Amino acid sequence: MADLATFNWREPDYRPIWTERLERLQRLRADPGILPGLKAFYADHPVEFINDWLCTFDPRNVERGIEAVTPFLLFPKQAAFVEFVVARWRGREDWLCEKSRDMGVSWLCVAIATWMWLFHPGVVVGFGSRKEEYVDKLGDPKSLFWKIRETLNLLPAELLPKGYNERAHAPSMRIVNPENGSTIVGESGDN
C-alpha cells in the first residue's frame, strides 16, 4: 500500500493508487491460489481491506477536477474509528458515535458493514434512519444502501461472494451474502 503519511490530501493524485490496485488485481488473477490466504488476512485486517480495495463516491469532486469515484483511503482518525468499531463488535460492547458532516462516517460504516458481510459468516448488520429513503432508495447516492451496492459493484469479482447477483441478493432494505449467509438489513421509522 502507498505511504498514506505522505499522501497529499488537499490535492490528491489517485493515479499511483489506481496503478497499485491494478497491479494487485493482476497478481491475484495470475495466481488465484493466493485468494484464500488474502481473504483470511483481510478477515482480520479491515483497515487494510478498505485501503487496498474499497472506493467512495463524491459528486462534489468533479468541481475540483477529481473523479467522483476515488479509492477509499483512510485518514488516521478514520482508521482508528474502524479499529474502534471492530473492537466494540468483537467485544460485544455497546458504543455511540456522534456523526458530523463531511467526515465520512456514513462511508466508514458502509465499509465496515461490507467487510463484515464479506468475511464473517452469519453476521447481520443493521442500518436505520427516521425515513426509509435515507436508508434505501434505489438509484439515490444519498441513501446508505446505494453506497453499499456501489461499494460492492466497484469490488473485483474475485472478492465478491460466489453466486452474488445484485438483482437477486440486494432487494430493497436487504443485502444477502449467498456464500456465507451474512445480511445487511435496513430499518426506518416510517409508518
Label the predicted regions.
Residues A2-N191:
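Phosphate/NTP-binding elements of NTP-utilizing enzymes
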